[in-house]
Amino acid sequence: IGISGIEADGTLRDYDYREVKVAQTIIGHAREVWLAADTSKFNRPAMVEVGRLDQIDRLFTDAEPPAPFPALLEEAGVKLHIALDKKETTP
């Protein structure tokens, strides 16, 4: 799933209530929930609550999350995956 923001208490949020309903359905029925969120989403508020970090199994992001998120992820049992920036080079 994707979201608009993750608050410092671990609340996952979005702006579009229709997208929230879809994300909540996915969370409720999936065997494993993967969240994709770049680092701009941390400490970013949004209007509608999607869920909480403890409902997520894996988080994919572009850099190490700021404090307090590493501790929150560990406490929630979320596996963190940081994408590497591999620039293509031409021979």
Question: Where do the model's predicted regions map?
Answer:
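Conserved phosphate- and dinucleotide-binding cores of soluble alpha/beta proteins
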Residues: 1-91
